[in-house]
Amino acid sequence: MWTGWWLWPLVAVCTADQFRDNAVRLMQSTPVIDGHNDLPWALLKKFNNQLQDPRANLTSLNSTHTNIPKLKAGFVGAQFWSAYTPCDTQNKDSVKRTVEQIDVIQRMCQLYPETFLCVTDSAGIQQAFQEGKVASLVGVEGGHSIDSSLGVLRALYHLGMRYLTLTHSCNTPWADNWLVDTGEDKAQSQGLSSFGQSVVKEMNRLGIIIDLAHVSVATMEAALQLSKAPVIFSHSSAYSLCHHRRNVPDHVLQLVKQTGSLVMVNFYNDYVSCKAEANLSQVADHLDYIKKVAGAGAVGFGGDYDGVSRLPSGLEDVSKYPDLVAELLRRQWTEEEVRGALAENLLRVFKAVEQASDHKQAPGEEPIPLGQLEASCRTKYGYSGTPSLHLQPGSLLASLVTLLLSLCLL
């Protein structure tokens, strides 16, 4: 009965190697499309976006989760790079900052043309696959980047933006963020305001993917019900496995299934295990769970590399994707399901968004009501019958009191 027991560890190693070998084989023909990577933000923080600084060389930069050798080792074939600007830029220089981050992404493609190919559509991703390059797309992380302007939304589209996260971790004047669900922020729009609905419709018209990572549950529900095209969660996980409000609850996963939408699983420990520590197997648990609830077509990868401080053991950087794919194969995912999670699910969603677009339709023109905007530096141009500067709440009352007092003194 115990004959050859000493061979068991060797058999286990061989089996593990076989899963990884199969993962590599699959990824050579179907590389990863990752939904969210914050390398551009890391380049701003470390080098003030100066890519020609020798220290910023992406072939040798080792202080980030992402560099060119790691991307190649991880079989990353397409990346939505995050054009991110923090919430404290809202009502200030968010548009300027966003354009600068888009510029960084485009300069990455110019500086490393042998590695990166900047693309703006699903066909471009497939072209990059054929050329053995990393298709590089722009995802703008946070609705504050459009400064409540459909004109800015369109301008960012023309600069290459192909998804917009409706909020980051702050409300916009037209959409609520996930902190509303924790009680840390107050709901302003009950999901989406009338202008927020106009943003969603204009994104549909243009062919911009709607990203619901970071939004409140009410905003998830409103956008999923309103959008004519599938949406994505570019870097979120399953709420049932980790009760963090950045994750997606089961009833929303059902809406994801009904609409053909996509959840690209985040690797941040706090969203994976709800603890400071996590491991690769727990990330696979989230992938398993979303597949069970929403279907194999609803699963993707959104690692959030270079945007988080803690990553699971076994997924320390972008080179580790083959190990995660090997774990899915070990869990008896079919090759078809794995190819879907790697790339085909995102390509399906992207193509559906493109097909739903209608550039012949008249663009949205209704501006957000001036009273819904904040910050005293806004001018009145285009808004009739208003002061030359948009006054903060209470300022109008103060002005009326001053006027009445002056009349009494006459």
Curated annotation (Swiss-Prot):
It is found in: Apical cell membrane; Cell projection, Microvillus membrane. One of its GO terms (biological process) is leukotriene metabolic process. Pfam families: Peptidase_M19. InterPro entries: Dipep_AS, Metal_Hydrolase, Pept_M19. One of its GO terms (molecular function) is modified amino acid binding. It catalyses: an L-aminoacyl-L-amino acid + H2O = 2 an L-alpha-amino acid; leukotriene D4 + H2O = leukotriene E4 + glycine; L-cystine-bis-glycine + 2 H2O = L-cystine + 2 glycine; a beta-lactam + H2O = a substituted beta-amino acid. Keywords: Cell membrane, Cell projection, Dipeptidase, Disulfide bond, Glycoprotein, GPI-anchor, Hydrolase, Lipid metabolism, Lipoprotein, Membrane, Metal-binding, Metalloprotease, Protease, Signal, Zinc. Residues 385-410 form a propeptide. The keyword NADP does not apply. Glycans are attached at residues 57, 62, 279. Gene3D superfamilies: Metal-dependent hydrolases. Homodimer; disulfide-linked. PANTHER family: DIPEPTIDASE 1, MICROSOMAL DIPEPTIDASE. Belongs to the metallo-dependent hydrolases superfamily. Peptidase M19 family. This is Dipeptidase 1. It comes from Ovis aries. The lineage of its organism: Eukaryota, Metazoa, Chordata, Craniata, Vertebrata.
